[in-house]
């Protein structure tokens, strides 16, 4: 059984004029245990909408999503989400931000267990030295590390990432990508990530799923990324297979024509 099953999901919104807009149209996708899937596509095609539906933050207009065999009806501890914004509480230390999530996920656990889980999560992202620092005292990259630690601390079945490195400089982004790969390989967590960065998708993914242009977006194409793991960033830069993936994805994104606006109305 797949860890995550997206079954014939459609999502409609109503604008201020009362007109309906079909954002997603009958999207179906099965994501296997420990698989890393990246969602790509033009801005506004519904990638983040789909991720929010998987997170339980939005309810689909039609269709259903199952996680570990259970139909999703709202947020749950088996799914954790990391956004582009770190979303840390500024009056709490890095440790306290992580502990707050752990306390919610493991209700009734002893204080010693909560402390251990929180500290281990920060250790996982190499932030032992920043455990008592406040968000304003650490860099943007370190804030995102705390966000990732908070997500892994609750031991989710599925990790959802919405452009978590999009606002970071290239070197910090590369470092966090490497950290993410290391942690995912260690924890065997299933990951669904939204990104606009093609190279990031190729480096991280087992599969890259491209949505068609919206409105009424569907799955346009899927690439199976079969380069061997662990992946070497420098070797991938000149690897023939990776270059071919990059070429095909760029061609897809640049040549894809928009669906006429009227086709998205319902």
Model-derived regions, located:
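Helix-to-loop junction immediately C-terminal to a conserved catalytic motif
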Residues: 55
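Conserved ABC ATPase "signature" region
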Residues: 110-130, 182
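Conserved ABC transporter NBD signature motif
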Residues: 63-75
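Hydrophobic anchor residue at the start of the ABC signature
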Residues: 82, 148
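Conserved signature/switch motifs of ABC ATPase nucleotide-binding domains
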Residues: 133-136, 154
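The feature captures the beta-strand-to-loop junction immediately N-terminal to the Walker
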Residues: 40-42
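Short coil-to-helix segment of the ABC ATPase nucleotide-binding domain corresponding to the Q-loop/switch region
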Residues: 92-101, 202
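A short, flexible loop at the N-terminus of ABC-type nucleotide-binding domains that lies
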Residues: 1-3, 12-26
């Amino acid at each position: 059984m797949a860890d995550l099953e997206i079954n014939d999901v459609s999502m409609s919104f109503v604008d201020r004029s009362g007109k309906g807009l079909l954002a997603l149209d009958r999207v179906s996708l099965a994501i296997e245990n420990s698989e890393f899937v990246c969602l790509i596509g033009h801005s506004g095609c519904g990638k983040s909408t789909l991720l929010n539906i998987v997170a339980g933050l939005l309810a689909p207009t039609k269709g259903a999503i199952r996680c570990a065999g259970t139909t999703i009806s709202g947020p749950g501890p088996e799914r954790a989400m990391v956004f582009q914004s770190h979303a840390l509480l500024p009056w709490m230390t890095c440790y306290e931000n992580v502990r707050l999530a752990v306390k919610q996920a493991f209700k009734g656990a002893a204080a010693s267990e909560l402390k251990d889980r929180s500290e281990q999560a920060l250790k996982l992202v190499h932030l032992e030295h920043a455990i008592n620092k406040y968000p304003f005292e650490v860099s943007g990259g370190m804030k995102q590390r705390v966000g990732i630690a908070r997500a892994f601390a609750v031991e989710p079945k599925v990790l959802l990432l919405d452009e978590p490195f999009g606002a970071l400089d290239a070197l910090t982004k590369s470092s966090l990508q490497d950290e993410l790969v290391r942690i995912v390989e260690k924890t065997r967590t299933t990951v669904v990530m939204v990104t606009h960065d093609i190279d990031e998708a190729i480096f991280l993914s087992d599969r890259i799923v491209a949505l068609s242009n919206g409105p009424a977006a569907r799955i346009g194409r899927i690439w199976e990324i079969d380069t061997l793991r662990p992946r070497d960033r420098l070797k991938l830069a000149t690897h023939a297979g990776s270059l071919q993936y990059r070429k095909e994805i760029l061609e897809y994104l640049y040549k894809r024509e928009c669906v006429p606006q009227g086709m998205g109305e319902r």
